[in-house]
């Protein structure tokens, strides 16, 4: 009995003395992850990613935070302050650089280089995910925020057989729909929805005016004739919206939209996943780009991403390596986007198969064309173009403008420029 105890003690001592690298090899890869994705197509997609990680031998521990992004960010901040950040978390756009200064992150450069990944994704995304010159986050999926969904039943009521190509054509069609008793614009009443409407209008008027005003915050661009024109168009949108949907999600109006009681929905490509999740039929919807007065493709980009936080535990470090490799794989991106209605981050994915929708194929083609012609823009309303404080200040102005018709377009332009000045200090 004494010999047996001595053997056990010797074995335990040997294990404790084993090199850390050997213990790391024995650790089962584990990922702790927090996000706001808990339901709908986003919830289904992230659950699918977790299952794939488990199939590859990992452990997936997702802690969804109910509510909007603010609640998730508060949880993340609390975990970081407590010295217990998750292995990975939802984070996007310029906030990746901001938050990387709060806590140490994982250098993903070797994995990205081995996958040849950087050359496969839009250049606008590269800088956002490698602040200070190193990859610390990875994009998961891409959406176009300027997608036009048209109710075919509504189109039939007014004899429309094609999508408008210019804002003048859009306005004429909306006028006909209103005369026919159709609410021309299906909308939501949430802040980001209001903010999207300006980027939709401005990107369809002039690509470079958008880049200068909303991405570079150039004072002249913020007060330009194109910006005034965008505010005029935004007022038209507001007049054609359902005023009874205050503070509600746009999906509340989708049943009316699918029946033809509402005509046109300007939304991100994710609406495809929402429509399918609600049991709607995409055959009842024409999906294309919002009007482009310049006659050239423009892609206003929104991307969901994960940032990887430095952890010393071998199992978490191994889990981060496994997760990062999976996120860059073509088949994983295909499955994720097919679930949510997005398009893959990789530009080399073939979308000709039956699992993809016509809307996804069209958006992917526009992304590739815009990528080649350098007409890819970053979304303001979805925190891709600016940091949260500046975005919030601008959205405040836009929300007030949309819901208060006493504010003139000229006043709207002036207030937006002033809000930017104040937010920048």
Can you describe what each PLM-predicted range is?
Residues 18, 135-140, 146, 171-219, ...:
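Extracytoplasmic/periplasmic solute-binding protein
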Residues 29, 51, 55-56, 156-158, ...:
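Extracytoplasmic/periplasmic substrate-recognition and gating elements
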Residues 94-146, 171, 197, 286-287:
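Hinge/lid segment of periplasmic solute-binding proteins
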Residues 104, 110, 270-274, 306-388, ...:
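Mature extracytoplasmic/periplasmic domains
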Residues 109-121, 189, 205-229, 277-280, ...:
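Short, solvent-exposed loop/beta-turn-alpha elements that line the ligand-binding surface or hinge
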Residues 174-176, 216-246:
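Glycine-centered hinge/linker elements that transmit conformational signals in sensory
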């Amino acid at each position: 009995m004494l010999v047996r105890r001595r053997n056990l003690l010797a074995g335990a001592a040997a294990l404790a003395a084993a090199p850390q690298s050997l213990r790391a090899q024995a650790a089962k890869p584990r990922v702790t992850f927090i996000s706001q994705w808990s339901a709908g197509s986003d919830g289904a997609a992230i659950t699918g990613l977790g299952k794939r990680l488990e199939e590859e031998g990992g452990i997936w521990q997702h802690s969804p935070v109910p509510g909007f992004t603010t609640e998730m960010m508060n949880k993340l901040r609390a975990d970081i302050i407590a010295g217990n950040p998750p292995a990975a978390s939802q984070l996007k756009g310029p906030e990746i650089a901001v938050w990387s200064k709060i806590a140490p992150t994982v250098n993903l450069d070797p994995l990205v280089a081995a996958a040849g990944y950087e050359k496969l994704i839009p250049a606008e995304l590269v800088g956002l995910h490698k602040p200070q010159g190193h990859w610390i986050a990875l994009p998961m999926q891409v959406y176009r925020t300027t997608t036009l969904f048209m109710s075919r039943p509504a189109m039939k009521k007014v004899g429309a057989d094609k999508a408008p190509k210019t804002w003048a054509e859009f306005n004429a069609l909306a006028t006909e729909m209103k005369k026919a008793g159709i609410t021309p614009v299906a909308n939501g009443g949430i802040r980001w929805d209001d903010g999207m409407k300006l980027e939709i209008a401005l990107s369809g008027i002039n690509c470079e005016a958008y880049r200068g005003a909303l991405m570079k915050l150039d004072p002249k661009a913020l007060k330009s004739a194109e910006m005034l024109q965008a505010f005029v168009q935004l007022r038209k949108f507001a007049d054609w919206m359902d005023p009874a949907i205050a503070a509600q999600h746009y999906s509340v109006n989708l049943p009316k939209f699918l029946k033809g009681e509402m005509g046109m929905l300007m939304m991100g490509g994710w609406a495809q996943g929402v429509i399918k999740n609600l049991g709607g039929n995409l055959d009842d919807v024409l999906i294309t780009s919002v009007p482009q007065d310049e006659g050239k493709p423009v892609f206003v980009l929104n991307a969901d991403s994960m940032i990887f936080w430095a952890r010393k535990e071998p199992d978490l470090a191994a889990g981060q390596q496994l997760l990062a490799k999976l996120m860059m794989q073509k088949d994983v991106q295909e499955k994720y986007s097919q679930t949510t209605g997005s398009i893959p981050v990789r530009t080399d994915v073939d979308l000709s198969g039956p699992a993809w929708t016509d809307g996804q194929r069209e958006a992917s083609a526009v992304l590739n064309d815009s990528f080649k012609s350098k007409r890819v823009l970053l979304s303001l309303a979805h925190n891709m173009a600016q940091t949260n404080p500046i975005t919030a200040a601008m959205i405040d102005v836009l929300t007030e403008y949309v819901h208060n018709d006493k504010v003139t377009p000229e006043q709207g332009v002036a207030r937006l420029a002033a809000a930017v000045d104040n937010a920048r200090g």
